[in-house]
Protein backbone atom coordinates (compact mmCIF):
# COMPACT_ATOMS: atom_id res chain seq x y z
CA UNK A 1 0.00 0.00 0.00
CA UNK A 2 1.52 3.31 -1.04
CA UNK A 3 1.52 6.25 1.35
CA UNK A 4 1.87 8.57 -1.68
CA UNK A 5 -1.42 7.67 -3.33
CA UNK A 6 -3.64 6.40 -0.53
CA UNK A 7 -5.02 2.85 -0.85
CA UNK A 8 -3.70 1.38 -4.07
CA UNK A 9 -6.11 1.19 -6.99
CA UNK A 10 -5.82 -2.58 -7.24
CA UNK A 11 -6.80 -2.97 -3.59
CA UNK A 12 -9.81 -5.36 -3.77
CA UNK A 13 -11.27 -3.83 -0.59
CA UNK A 14 -11.31 -0.29 -1.99
CA UNK A 15 -15.02 -0.30 -2.84
CA UNK A 16 -15.83 -1.54 0.65
CA UNK A 17 -13.90 1.17 2.48
CA UNK A 18 -15.55 4.08 4.26
CA UNK A 19 -14.61 7.73 3.89
CA UNK A 20 -12.40 9.50 6.47
CA UNK A 21 -15.22 11.77 7.67
CA UNK A 22 -17.41 8.70 8.25
CA UNK A 23 -14.70 7.00 10.28
CA UNK A 24 -14.19 10.10 12.42
CA UNK A 25 -17.91 10.58 12.95
CA UNK A 26 -18.66 6.97 13.87
CA UNK A 27 -15.63 6.20 16.02
CA UNK A 28 -15.19 9.51 17.86
CA UNK A 29 -15.45 8.42 21.50
CA UNK A 30 -16.81 11.80 22.51
CA UNK A 31 -19.69 11.65 20.04
CA UNK A 32 -22.74 9.73 21.26
CA UNK A 33 -24.44 9.26 17.89
CA UNK A 34 -27.09 6.55 17.73
CA UNK A 35 -25.94 4.69 14.63
CA UNK A 36 -23.37 1.91 14.83
CA UNK A 37 -20.65 1.17 12.31
CA UNK A 38 -19.02 -2.26 12.00
CA UNK A 39 -15.67 -2.89 10.35
CA UNK A 40 -14.90 -6.58 10.16
CA UNK A 41 -12.46 -9.10 8.81
CA UNK A 42 -12.80 -12.85 8.39
CA UNK A 43 -10.09 -15.47 8.07
CA UNK A 44 -11.15 -18.99 7.03
CA UNK A 45 -9.32 -22.02 8.38
CA UNK A 46 -5.57 -21.83 7.98
CA UNK A 47 -5.67 -19.44 5.04
CA UNK A 48 -3.48 -16.36 5.15
CA UNK A 49 -5.79 -14.10 3.15
CA UNK A 50 -8.26 -11.93 5.04
CA UNK A 51 -11.71 -10.89 3.79
CA UNK A 52 -12.73 -7.39 4.91
CA UNK A 53 -16.00 -5.50 4.74
CA UNK A 54 -18.02 -2.81 6.52
CA UNK A 55 -21.60 -2.46 7.71
CA UNK A 56 -23.97 -0.04 9.43
CA UNK A 57 -27.28 -0.15 11.24
CA UNK A 58 -30.36 -0.45 9.05
CA UNK A 59 -33.75 -1.10 10.61
CA UNK A 60 -31.87 -3.60 12.79
CA UNK A 61 -28.62 -3.54 14.68
CA UNK A 62 -25.52 -4.13 12.63
CA UNK A 63 -24.58 -7.26 14.60
CA UNK A 64 -27.82 -8.95 13.57
CA UNK A 65 -27.24 -7.92 9.97
CA UNK A 66 -23.77 -9.47 10.06
CA UNK A 67 -24.99 -12.78 11.49
CA UNK A 68 -27.74 -13.12 8.89
CA UNK A 69 -25.40 -12.16 6.05
CA UNK A 70 -22.70 -14.53 7.32
CA UNK A 71 -25.01 -17.52 7.66
CA UNK A 72 -27.01 -16.97 4.45
CA UNK A 73 -24.35 -16.16 1.87
CA UNK A 74 -22.40 -19.38 2.13
CA UNK A 75 -22.55 -22.76 3.83
CA UNK A 76 -19.65 -24.12 5.77
CA UNK A 77 -19.29 -27.25 7.82
CA UNK A 78 -19.41 -26.89 11.62
CA UNK A 79 -15.88 -28.31 11.69
CA UNK A 80 -14.57 -25.42 9.58
CA UNK A 81 -12.46 -23.04 11.60
CA UNK A 82 -13.05 -19.33 11.18
CA UNK A 83 -11.66 -16.26 12.93
CA UNK A 84 -13.74 -13.06 12.94
CA UNK A 85 -12.62 -9.64 14.16
CA UNK A 86 -15.14 -6.87 14.72
CA UNK A 87 -14.30 -3.19 15.15
CA UNK A 88 -17.51 -1.62 16.46
CA UNK A 89 -18.29 2.02 17.16
CA UNK A 90 -20.59 0.78 19.96
CA UNK A 91 -20.38 -2.43 21.97
CA UNK A 92 -23.28 -4.90 21.47
CA UNK A 93 -26.52 -4.38 23.37
CA UNK A 94 -28.02 -7.12 25.52
CA UNK A 95 -30.25 -8.50 22.76
CA UNK A 96 -27.43 -8.56 20.24
CA UNK A 97 -25.21 -10.29 22.77
CA UNK A 98 -27.83 -13.05 23.04
CA UNK A 99 -27.94 -13.41 19.25
CA UNK A 100 -24.14 -13.54 19.09
CA UNK A 101 -24.04 -16.21 21.80
CA UNK A 102 -26.60 -18.32 19.90
CA UNK A 103 -24.63 -17.88 16.68
CA UNK A 104 -21.40 -19.03 18.33
CA UNK A 105 -23.17 -22.00 19.94
CA UNK A 106 -24.23 -23.14 16.48
CA UNK A 107 -20.73 -22.56 15.08
CA UNK A 108 -18.36 -23.86 17.78
CA UNK A 109 -15.24 -23.44 15.63
CA UNK A 110 -15.79 -19.73 15.06
CA UNK A 111 -13.59 -17.42 17.13
CA UNK A 112 -14.79 -13.86 17.66
CA UNK A 113 -12.77 -10.83 18.76
CA UNK A 114 -14.59 -7.55 19.44
CA UNK A 115 -12.91 -4.14 19.66
CA UNK A 116 -15.38 -1.39 20.60
CA UNK A 117 -14.85 2.36 20.55
CA UNK A 118 -17.56 2.97 23.17
CA UNK A 119 -19.78 1.03 25.56
CA UNK A 120 -23.45 1.05 24.59
CA UNK A 121 -25.69 2.27 27.47
CA UNK A 122 -23.20 0.79 29.90
CA UNK A 123 -25.36 1.41 32.98
CA UNK A 124 -28.13 -0.85 31.63
CA UNK A 125 -27.82 -4.19 33.43
CA UNK A 126 -29.05 -6.10 30.39
CA UNK A 127 -26.20 -4.76 28.32
CA UNK A 128 -23.67 -5.41 31.07
CA UNK A 129 -24.86 -9.00 31.53
CA UNK A 130 -24.81 -9.52 27.78
CA UNK A 131 -21.14 -8.55 27.59
CA UNK A 132 -20.33 -10.83 30.53
CA UNK A 133 -22.11 -13.70 28.78
CA UNK A 134 -20.05 -13.12 25.65
CA UNK A 135 -16.84 -13.10 27.66
CA UNK A 136 -17.90 -16.33 29.39
CA UNK A 137 -18.57 -17.81 25.95
CA UNK A 138 -14.95 -17.12 24.99
CA UNK A 139 -15.37 -13.87 23.07
CA UNK A 140 -12.49 -11.44 23.52
CA UNK A 141 -13.82 -7.91 24.11
CA UNK A 142 -11.51 -4.89 24.25
CA UNK A 143 -11.82 -1.13 24.01
CA UNK A 144 -10.14 0.24 20.91
CA UNK A 145 -6.75 1.85 21.50
CA UNK A 146 -4.58 3.96 19.20
CA UNK A 147 -3.24 0.75 17.70
CA UNK A 148 -6.71 -0.39 16.58
CA UNK A 149 -7.61 3.08 15.29
CA UNK A 150 -4.48 3.16 13.13
CA UNK A 151 -5.13 -0.39 11.91
CA UNK A 152 -8.70 0.44 10.91
CA UNK A 153 -7.58 3.62 9.18
CA UNK A 154 -5.10 1.74 7.00
CA UNK A 155 -7.36 -1.22 6.22
CA UNK A 156 -10.94 0.10 6.19
CA UNK A 157 -10.73 3.80 5.31
CA UNK A 158 -10.22 5.44 1.93
CA UNK A 159 -7.63 7.74 3.45
CA UNK A 160 -6.17 10.72 1.55
CA UNK A 161 -2.83 10.51 -0.26
CA UNK A 162 0.25 10.85 1.94
CA UNK A 163 -1.89 10.29 5.04
CA UNK A 164 -1.50 6.60 5.78
CA UNK A 165 -0.60 7.17 9.43
CA UNK A 166 -3.60 8.02 11.57
CA UNK A 167 -3.53 9.47 15.07
CA UNK A 168 -6.87 9.57 16.89
CA UNK A 169 -7.90 13.09 17.77
CA UNK A 170 -9.67 11.75 20.82
CA UNK A 171 -7.98 12.02 24.22
CA UNK A 172 -6.26 8.80 25.23
CA UNK A 173 -7.96 9.28 28.59
CA UNK A 174 -11.34 8.41 27.07
CA UNK A 175 -9.98 5.05 25.95
CA UNK A 176 -8.70 4.32 29.46
CA UNK A 177 -12.01 5.30 31.05
CA UNK A 178 -14.01 3.03 28.76
CA UNK A 179 -11.48 0.26 29.39
CA UNK A 180 -11.93 0.73 33.14
CA UNK A 181 -15.71 0.47 32.82
CA UNK A 182 -15.37 -2.68 30.72
CA UNK A 183 -13.15 -4.10 33.47
CA UNK A 184 -15.93 -3.35 35.99
CA UNK A 185 -18.44 -5.12 33.77
CA UNK A 186 -16.19 -8.16 33.55
CA UNK A 187 -15.87 -8.30 37.34
CA UNK A 188 -19.60 -7.79 37.90
CA UNK A 189 -19.04 -4.46 39.67
CA UNK A 190 -21.50 -1.54 39.52
CA UNK A 191 -20.86 1.20 36.95
CA UNK A 192 -18.11 3.66 37.80
CA UNK A 193 -18.15 5.82 34.65
CA UNK A 194 -20.62 8.69 34.29
CA UNK A 195 -21.07 10.24 30.84
CA UNK A 196 -23.05 13.43 30.21
CA UNK A 197 -23.68 15.31 27.00
CA UNK A 198 -24.72 18.95 27.24
CA UNK A 199 -26.83 19.63 24.20
CA UNK A 200 -26.13 23.36 24.16
CA UNK A 201 -22.42 22.61 23.78
CA UNK A 202 -20.78 19.99 21.50
CA UNK A 203 -18.98 18.51 24.49
CA UNK A 204 -19.14 15.18 26.29
CA UNK A 205 -18.17 15.04 29.95
CA UNK A 206 -16.68 11.95 31.61
CA UNK A 207 -16.63 11.50 35.37
CA UNK A 208 -15.69 8.64 37.69
CA UNK A 209 -17.95 7.63 40.57
CA UNK A 210 -15.87 5.07 42.45
CA UNK A 211 -17.30 3.07 45.35
CA UNK A 212 -15.51 1.02 47.97
CA UNK A 213 -16.02 -2.17 45.93
CA UNK A 214 -14.10 -0.61 43.04
CA UNK A 215 -11.14 0.24 45.25
CA UNK A 216 -11.20 -3.25 46.75
CA UNK A 217 -11.28 -5.27 43.52
CA UNK A 218 -9.62 -3.12 40.86
CA UNK A 219 -5.80 -3.13 40.91
CA UNK A 220 -4.43 0.32 41.86
CA UNK A 221 -2.35 0.68 38.69
CA UNK A 222 -5.52 0.42 36.57
CA UNK A 223 -7.19 3.19 38.58
CA UNK A 224 -4.09 5.37 38.47
CA UNK A 225 -3.93 5.02 34.68
CA UNK A 226 -7.16 7.01 34.38
CA UNK A 227 -5.49 10.10 35.83
CA UNK A 228 -8.45 10.66 38.15
CA UNK A 229 -6.82 8.99 41.17
From Swiss-Prot:
<keyword id="KW-0378">Hydrolase</keyword>
<dbReference type="GO" id="GO:0016554">
    <property type="term" value="P:cytidine to uridine editing"/>
</dbReference>
<dbReference type="GO" id="GO:0008270">
    <property type="term" value="F:zinc ion binding"/>
</dbReference>
<dbReference type="InterPro" id="IPR016192">
    <property type="entry name" value="APOBEC/CMP_deaminase_Zn-bd"/>
</dbReference>
<dbReference type="InterPro" id="IPR041547">
    <property type="entry name" value="APOBEC1"/>
</dbReference>
<keyword id="KW-0479">Metal-binding</keyword>
<dbReference type="GO" id="GO:0003723">
    <property type="term" value="F:RNA binding"/>
</dbReference>
<keyword id="KW-0507">mRNA processing</keyword>
<keyword id="KW-0963">Cytoplasm</keyword>
<comment type="function">
    <text>Cytidine deaminase catalyzing the cytidine to uridine postranscriptional editing of a variety of mRNAs. Form complexes with cofactors that confer differential editing activity and selectivity. Responsible for the postranscriptional editing of a CAA codon for Gln to a UAA codon for stop in the apolipoprotein B mRNA. Also involved in CGA (Arg) to UGA (Stop) editing in the NF1 mRNA. May also play a role in the epigenetic regulation of gene expression by participating in DNA demethylation.</text>
</comment>
<dbReference type="GO" id="GO:0005634">
    <property type="term" value="C:nucleus"/>
</dbReference>
<comment type="subunit">
    <text>Homodimer. Interacts with A1CF; form an mRNA editing complex. Interacts with RBM47; form an mRNA editing complex. Found in a complex with CELF2/CUGBP2 and A1CF. Interacts with HNRPAB. Interacts with SYNCRIP.</text>
</comment>
<feature type="binding site">
    <location>
        <position position="93"/>
    </location>
    <ligand>
        <name>Zn(2+)</name>
    </ligand>
</feature>
<keyword id="KW-0862">Zinc</keyword>
<feature type="binding site">
    <location>
        <position position="61"/>
    </location>
    <ligand>
        <name>Zn(2+)</name>
    </ligand>
</feature>
<keyword id="KW-0539">Nucleus</keyword>
<dbReference type="InterPro" id="IPR016193">
    <property type="entry name" value="Cytidine_deaminase-like"/>
</dbReference>
<comment type="similarity">
    <text>Belongs to the cytidine and deoxycytidylate deaminase family.</text>
</comment>
<dbReference type="GO" id="GO:0004126">
    <property type="term" value="F:cytidine deaminase activity"/>
</dbReference>
<dbReference type="Pfam" id="PF18774">
    <property type="entry name" value="APOBEC4_like"/>
</dbReference>
<dbReference type="InterPro" id="IPR050610">
    <property type="entry name" value="APOBEC_Cyt_Deaminase"/>
</dbReference>
<feature type="binding site">
    <location>
        <position position="96"/>
    </location>
    <ligand>
        <name>Zn(2+)</name>
    </ligand>
</feature>
<dbReference type="GO" id="GO:0006397">
    <property type="term" value="P:mRNA processing"/>
</dbReference>
<protein>
    <recommendedName>
        <fullName>C-&gt;U-editing enzyme APOBEC-1</fullName>
        <ecNumber>3.5.4.-</ecNumber>
        <ecNumber>3.5.4.36</ecNumber>
    </recommendedName>
</protein>
<dbReference type="GO" id="GO:0044029">
    <property type="term" value="P:positive regulation of gene expression via chromosomal CpG island demethylation"/>
</dbReference>
<feature type="domain" description="CMP/dCMP-type deaminase">
    <location>
        <begin position="10"/>
        <end position="134"/>
    </location>
</feature>
<feature type="active site" description="Proton donor">
    <location>
        <position position="63"/>
    </location>
</feature>
<dbReference type="InterPro" id="IPR002125">
    <property type="entry name" value="CMP_dCMP_dom"/>
</dbReference>
<dbReference type="GO" id="GO:0005737">
    <property type="term" value="C:cytoplasm"/>
</dbReference>
Amino acid sequence: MSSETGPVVVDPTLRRRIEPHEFDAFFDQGELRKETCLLYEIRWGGRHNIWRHTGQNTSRHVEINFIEKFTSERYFYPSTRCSIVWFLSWSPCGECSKAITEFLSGHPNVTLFIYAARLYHHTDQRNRQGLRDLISRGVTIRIMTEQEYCYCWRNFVNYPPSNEVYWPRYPNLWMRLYALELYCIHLGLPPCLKIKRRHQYPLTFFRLNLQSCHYQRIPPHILWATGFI
